[in-house]
Structures are given as structure tokens and as C-alpha cells.
Design a protein with these regions (language model features):
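An intracellular "coupling" helix at the cytosolic face of ABC transporter transmembrane type-1 domains
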Residues: 16, 107-108, 124-133, 137, ...
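Transmembrane helices of ABC transporter permease
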Residues: 13, 17-27, 68, 135-189, ...
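ABC-type nucleotide-binding domain
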Residues: 331-573
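Short intracellular "coupling" helices and adjacent cytoplasmic loop segments at the cytosolic face
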Residues: 88, 95-128, 199-223, 311-331, ...
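Hydrophobic alpha-helical segments in the permease module
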Residues: 64-72, 76, 169-173, 177, ...
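Transmembrane helix-loop-helix hairpins at lipid-water interfaces of multipass membrane proteins
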Residues: 18-75, 155-160, 271-275
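Cytosolic ends of transmembrane helices, especially the final helix of ABC transmembrane type-1 domains
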Residues: 193, 216, 240, 288-315
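Membrane-integrated ABC transporters
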Residues: 1-32, 47-61, 79-90, 94, ...
Length: 573
């Protein structure tokens, strides 16, 4: 019931459309109910009169019915058009809300959840929700109006024949609700399995170059086949439940016709019912059966819609671990003095410490370099500064202000990152550079590209800055992508800079170009550099050696070589 309440909340902005839609649905149903009763009344009254009276009344009846069906048609148009648009608008609202929430969720959520499943919730789940949002209330309302209306007329025609039909309907609904619980389970499983299919597909397509380079198409085919077959099994279970549900309801509907014919014939034989009334009963049974069939289909639609909505709520009710404090303030006039004060950290799902008692002081405009073996926590130290994760002990300050007391947007807007794994968005080179400063002028973009030593290369391309980079920048080399990402940070112009192994995956020539760009980028900025190639960080103001036990050594390049310790051993390898 709580799920239904939350679902109803999304009708709020469209109340007027919703109620007009229900009124139109009621008109459609009442017109369908009215015709058999009009026919019955005329058969017993008008059509027993003389010829002249019948001919005189027919034009009035024709015009009245014509107007009635025109009104019904207009109502049907509104229900079909505006009703569907209401559902589409709700789908858009939910999708936007879900997308916005995805962007606010912490890194830990993305570490624990599959992007294919997330895309399934954003697309296919919400489509079924849209269909239910429109057709659910409308079909339920139409069906109830027709069922109640038909029963009233059936009682009005013959009470004795109506009683066994009520018993049949009650038995049918009890049976249907029991089947409904089983269907709900299969629909939820169906959702999970199609999410697995999406995840498998995305994983393979994203890594298609690796797949083909290793000639592992058969392995990927088997992986996809496994998830695809699992989805088929879930569909089979689903259809078994649906088959039992549909066939049992069809059986009960047949029993209604059987009772009407046999018991109605008995009542005629007993003189308790007229032959014409039995024919009218058959008409109303048809009207009565139709909404029952709609309700049966509605149950399937409801299960699809609500199972999708529950998955939607699972995400929406997941709170971000990283969010602004109630009294958070904006970070302004940043100098760039960064301080790690006895910082400790472990992941929320693992108590094993990643960092313990780390203290680093970086004066504004100074540079430090972090070196050490993989897994020692270098990237984690950098990830804590923009609050991709929160410290579990100690504190981090920028210009003396605890970062947990700052708004995330203002904090992150003052930090630029250049990473080893460069991500370029689908679009042009210009679009990707401008990502560092939305709304930047062409002159600003060109200046940033020149600073990153990528302008000349761009101008050699046929389309220049309007060159399409391909998905994830597949049309560019690693060095070209890296320089575009550096241009993006130049355009952002942050006072604090994080360089996370920005040159480790490049060839020597590309590294020289990138290193030159990074040196230019680092001027007068507080810079934290992670590097495996120690030759790139010799000029850092301080080099800190991180091991699994914490900070092992710290000092300048010359000082650490003189100590002949861990750093010297790395350098002389």
C-alpha cells in the first residue's frame, strides 16, 4: 500500500488531466451501458405502438444517439491522446528524477552496482510504469463502472439470475488474487534477468576491442547466452503463471454464459422470466465480461508497472553517503592550502583500513608527489580531497576549512583532475574541451588547447574543433585524448590540481608532450601528483613514499636519494 501511495504522488502535477480522463472514461462506459437499456425500453414501449408514432420518433432517437456517440468519440480521443501524454509526462518526470539521483549517488554505489542494471531501471522499467500510469486508473475506473452498472441492470431485469453470477464473480476474484501473488514474483525476477542481459551486452560492447584482440568472441557469446537463457527461463515461469491466470478467468467467464443460458432457460420454463429479457441479459453479460477481461489484462500491466516502480524506488530511497551538511558553506577565494590531518579511511562494506593516520601539509601553490606500490592508497588519498569518499578518521581542510563543511559543488569546482583513464564524451573536440567550463567562448577553448599543446593537431583535422571524437574518444590516440583532457582542466582553471598517473600509459614521445603540458598546467597551483615513472616528479617540492604501513619516507628528490631507502630503491630499478 505504501508503494501505491508513492506512485500516486507522481499524478500531482497532472490532476486536472487525470480527473478529466476519468470523467471521459465514465462517459464512454455509460454510453455502452445505456444502449441495451434504451433498446429494451423501446422494445417494450415505442415498438409496440402504431406505425406513425414509431416513424415520428425515429428521427429524434437517431439524432439523440448520433450526439451520444459523437460525445463518446470525443471522450475516447481525449482518453487516448491526453491520457497517454499524462503517462508519458510521468515517465519523463521519473526518468529525470532517477537520472538526477544517479548523479548524486556516491562512488561506493557504483562500485557495488552494475551499470547495465541501472540503465534497465532508467529505460525499460519506466516504460512499463508509464503504461500503467495511464491505463491503470482509467481501465480500473471503466471496468468498475461497467461491472457495477451491468450488475444493476441485471438485478433490475431479473434478481434470481443475478445471484449465481455474483457468486461466480466472487470466486473468480478470490482465485485471481491468489494467482496474482505468484505473478508478482515472476515479474520481479523477469526485471532482474533483463537487467543482467543489459549488463552483459554493455560489458561486451564496451570492451569489444579487447574481445576481438584476444579472439574471445566465443567466450563472450557463451556469457551472453547464459544471461539470455536465464531471461528466457524467467519468461517461461512468468508465462506459466499468466497462462494459469488467463485460462482460469476465461473458464469463469464461460461459466457465466453457461449459468445465464441454463438457469435463464429454467426461469423461462417456470414463467419467471420473459424470452426478450434473457436476450437482454446476454447483451449485458457481454458488457459485463468485457471489463473483466480488461481487469485481467490490467493485473498483468499492474504487476509489470509496480515491479518496475519498486526497482525505481530501490534507487530513489538509496541515500548518497556523500552529501552536503545542513550548514554547509560555499568555498570561495581559494588560495589552495590543503592539509590532511591524521586521516584514516576504510570502505563502508569493509572494516580493513586502507589508510591509517596520514598527515600531509601542502602550502598553496606547492606540489607534492605520491609514490609507492599499487594498492598502497595513493589514489584513495587523492579521492578523499574532492569527497568522492569521506574520511573515517581525522580531517582534510582547504584554506583551513574542513571539506565536510563545504558544499560539494563549490569544493569540486576548485579541483581539477587529470587521470590515466581519460573519458571523452560522445561529441566533438570542442564539446569535450568546453566540458571544463560550460558556456566558454571559442577564444577561451582555443587558448586552453594551445596551453595543452593540442591546438596544432586539431587544426590539421578536416573539421578542426568540430571533429567528432567517437564513443569514449575512439577516433583519437591515447596521447591526443590525454591532451584534450588537460585542455579541459586548463579551461576550468582550478587552484588545486590532482594528476593521477596521467602519463603512465603513453609512449615516450606522447609522454614528453604531455609532461610539458602538465608542467605548464601545474604552475602556481597546489598540485598532487601520483606517478610510477619517478623521472616525472623529480621537481616536486615534496615526494611522499606511501606503503601499506602508511608514509614510509618524505622529502625532496635529492634528499630521498641520499637516504638510500625505499624511494632510492624504486628510482634505481
Amino acid at each position: 500500500m505504501n508503494t501505491i501511495k508513492k506512485f500516486i504522488h507522481y499524478y500531482g502535477p497532472y490532476k486536472a488531466v487525470f480527473f478529466i480522463d476519468l470523467i471521459c472514461a465514465a462517459v464512454i462506459s455509460l454510453v455502452d451501458l445505456a444502449y441495451p437499456q434504451i433498446l429494451r425500453t423501446m422494445t417494450k414501449t415505442l415498438f409496440t405502438q402504431d406505425k406513425d408514432m414509431i416513424l415520428h420518433a425515429l428521427p429524434v432517437i437517431a439524432v439523440s444517439l448520433f450526439v451520444m456517440y459523437i460525445v463518446q468519440s470525443l471522450c475516447k480521443y481525449y482518453v487516448t491522446c491526453q491520457g497517454h501524454m499524462m503517462g508519458a509526462n510521468m515517465e519523463r518526470d521519473m526518468r529525470q528524477e532517477l537520472f538526477d539521483h544517479y548523479q548524486q549517488l556516491s562512488f561506493s554505489y557504483y562500485s557495488q552496482n552494475n551499470s547495465g542494471q541501472m540503465m534497465s531501471k532508467l529505460v525499460s522499467d519506466l516504460f512499463d510504469i508509464s503504461e500503467f500510469a495511464h491505463h491503470g486508473p482509467e481501465n480500473l475506473f471503466i471496468s468498475l463502472v461497467k461491472i457495477v452498472g451491468a450488475f444493476i441492470f441485471l438485478f433490475f431485469i431479473n434478481k434470481k439470475l443475478a445471484l449465481p453470477l455474483i457468486i461466480l464473480v466472487i470466486v473468480m476474484f478470490v482465485f485471481s488474487f491468489r494467482q496474482n501473488a505468484k505473478m508478482q514474483e515472476t515479474f520481479m525476477e523477469n526485471r532482474r534477468k533483463i537487467g543482467d542481459v543489459n549488463a552483459s551486452l554493455q560489458d561486451t560492447l564496451s570492451g569489444i576491442r579487447v574481445v576481438q584482440s584476444f579472439a574471445n568472441e566465443d567466450i563472450e557469446r557463451e556469457k551472453f547466452k547464459k544471461s539470455n537463457e536465464a531471461f528466457l527461463v524467467s519468461k517461461r515461469d512468468n508465462y506459466h503463471c499468466m497462462g494459469g491466470f488467463m485460462s482460469s478467468n476465461l473458464f469463469f467467464q464461460g461459466m457465466m454464459y453457461l449459468v445465464t443460458l441454463v438457469y435463464g432457460g429454467y426461469l423461462i420454463a417456470q414463467g419467471e422470466m420473459q424470452t426478450g429479457d434473457l436476450a437482454m441479459y446476454a447483451l449485458y453479460i457481454g458488457i459485463f465480461i468485457s471489463p473483466i477481461q480488461i481487469l485481467v489484462e490490467l493485473v498483468e500491466m499492474m504487476q509489470k508497472g509496480l515491479s518496475g516502480f519498486r526497482r525505481f524506488l530501490d534507487v530513489m530511497e538509496t541515500e548518497s553517503e556523500i552529501k552536503d551538511a545542513d550548514d554547509a558553506v560555499e568555498l570561495k577565494d581559494v588560495k589552495g592550502h590543503v592539509r590532511y590531518d591524521h586521516v584514516s579511511f576504510h570502505y563502508s562494506d569493509d572494516e580493513t583500513p586502507v589508510l591509517s593516520d596520514i598527515s600531509i601539509d601542502i602550502p598553496a601553490g606547492r606540489s607534492i608527489a605520491l609514490v609507492g606500490p599499487s594498492g598502497s592508497g595513493k589514489t584513495t588519498i587523492c579521492s578523499l580531497l574532492p569527497r568522492f569518499y569521506d574520511v573515517t578518521g581525522g580531517s582534510i581542510t582547504v584554506d583551513g576549512k574542513n571539506i565536510r563543511g563545504l558544499t560539494l559543488k563549490s569544493l569540486r569546482s576548485q579541483i581539477g583532475m587529470v587521470q590515466q583513464d581519460v573519458y571523452l564524451f560522445d561529441g566533438t573536440i570542442k564539446d569535450n574541451i568546453a566540458y571544463g567550463k560550460p558556456g566558454a567562448t571559442d577564444d577561451e577553448i582555443i587558448k586552453a588547447a594551445k596551453c595543452a599543446s593540442i591546438h596544432d593537431f586539431i587544426m590539421e583535422l578536416p573539421d578542426g574543433y568540430d571533429t567528432y571524437v567517437g564513443e569514449r574518444g575512439t577516433r583519437l590516440s591515447g596521447g591526443q585524448k590525454q591532451r584534450i583532457s588537460i585542455a579541459r582542466v586548463f579551461l576550468k582553471n582550478p587552484p588545486i590540481l590532482i594528476l593521477d598517473e596521467a602519463t603512465s600509459a603513453l609512449d615516450n614521445e606522447s609522454e614528453r608532450w604531455i609532461q610539458k603540458s602538465l608542467e605548464e598546467l601545474s604552475k602556481n597551483r597546489t598540485t598532487i601528483t601520483i606517478a610510477h615513472r619517478l623521472s616525472t616528479i623529480r621537481d616536486a617540492d615534496e615526494i611522499i613514499v606511501i606503503t601499506e604501513d602508511g608514509i614510509a619516507e618524505r622529502g625532496t628528490h635529492a634528499e630521498l636519494l641520499a637516504q638510500n631507502g625505499v624511494y632510492a630503491a624504486y628510482y634505481n630499478m
